[in-house]
């Protein structure tokens, strides 16, 4: 039929299939059906995997039916040209592989920022960047506390070796201040009145917090030292008053005991003297010594009389 009318689809041969530009398909199953325009129909099915050549053969003239074999117009419509496939496919594959490698190689961290009253979620590939992206206004107090703690640690490490001498110096200063206050306390009131230049004075400014205490020589003292001196003076006064009261009570007790003992001795003497006066005959004597002598002589005479009567 194609031969009579001069048009139609020629029978395609297997040799022409190898010349097709199918490099973009690779190894695939091919189902090809070829029809002729005559009464007889040549149908064949080819299933299998064929290595498609990447080189397109030149079209050639076949004497059978007078057709030029090559890539037909329909093949060009259904199959894209070779150059485009060779250029586009590798680029697309490379891009996909590069993206997959980047996604697999990257590690992302979830960082929860709970500083302050807010909670924020940060997603970053680097943990350092996530901390750098924290809000500056959310944790200024934390940074200040960390800086202060670092400074305190540095100061403490530096003071470990020199802590004892500093304490000794402080104790010496306190002792010196206490001794100076004791010496000033023992001064008499007349000396304080006459020496007006050396007397301590208190200067009070407009604010209560800015009070300064001037010492005996006009040297300003801090509020802490002033409080220490005041407390020490009060304690010394209390001690002196307590000691004075104790001494006074002891002295008064001794005096009373002495007086009582003296009174008791005098009373006993007066009682004995009165008894002797009543015993001794004769005139009443005023001097107690004479009364005692007369009483002794009288007792001796009575003893002699008693012996004579027994004899």
Swiss-Prot record:
Domain of life: Eukaryota
Keyword Cell inner membrane tagged: no
Record GO biological process: regulation of DNA-templated transcription
Matches recorded under PROSITE patterns: BHLH
InterPro entries found in the cross-reference section: bHLH_dom (IPR011598), SAC51-like (IPR037546)
Cellular localization per UniProt: Nucleus
GO cellular component, one term: nucleus
bHLH domain ranges (all copies): 253-302
A Pfam short name: bHLH_SAC51
Residues annotated as signal peptide: none
PANTHER family tied to this protein: TRANSCRIPTION FACTOR BHLH145
Subunit-level organization: Homodimer.
Protein name: Transcription factor bHLH145
Species name: Arabidopsis thaliana
């Amino acid at each position: 039929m194609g031969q009579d009318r001069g048009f139609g689809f020629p029978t395609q041969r297997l040799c022409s299939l190898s010349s097709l530009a199918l490099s973009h398909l690779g190894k695939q199953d091919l189902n090809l059906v070829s029809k002729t325009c005559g009464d007889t129909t040549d149908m064949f099915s080819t299933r299998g995997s064929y290595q498609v050549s990447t080189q397109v053969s030149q079209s050639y003239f076949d004497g059978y039916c007078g057709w030029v074999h090559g890539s037909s117009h329909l093949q060009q419509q259904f199959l894209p040209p070779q150059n485009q496939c060779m250029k586009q496919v590798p680029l697309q594959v490379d891009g996909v592989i590069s993206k997959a490698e980047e996604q697999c190689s990257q590690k992302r961290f979830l960082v929860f920022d709970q500083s302050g009253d807010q909670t924020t979620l940060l997603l970053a590939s680097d943990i350092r960047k996530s901390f750098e992206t924290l809000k500056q206004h959310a944790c200024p107090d934390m940074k200040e506390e960390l800086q202060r703690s670092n400074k305190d640690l540095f100061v403490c490490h530096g003071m470990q070796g020199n802590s004892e001498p500093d304490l000794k110096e402080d104790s010496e200063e306190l002792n010196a201040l206490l001794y100076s206050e004791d010496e000033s306390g023992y001064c008499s009131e007349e000396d304080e009145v006459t020496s007006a230049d050396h007397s301590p004075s208190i200067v009070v400014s407009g604010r209560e917090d800015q009070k300064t205490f001037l010492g005996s020589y006009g040297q300003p003292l801090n509020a802490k030292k002033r409080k220490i001196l005041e407390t020490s003076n009060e304690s010394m006064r209390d001690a002196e008053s307590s000691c004075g009261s104790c001494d006074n009570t002891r002295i008064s007790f001794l005096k009373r005991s002495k007086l009582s003992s003296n009174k008791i001795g005098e009373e006993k003497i007066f009682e004995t003297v009165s008894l002797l006066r009543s015993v001794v005959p004769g005139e009443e004597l005023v001097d107690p010594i004479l009364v005692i002598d007369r009483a002794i002589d009288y007792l001796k005479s009575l003893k002699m009389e008693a012996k004579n009567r027994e004899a």
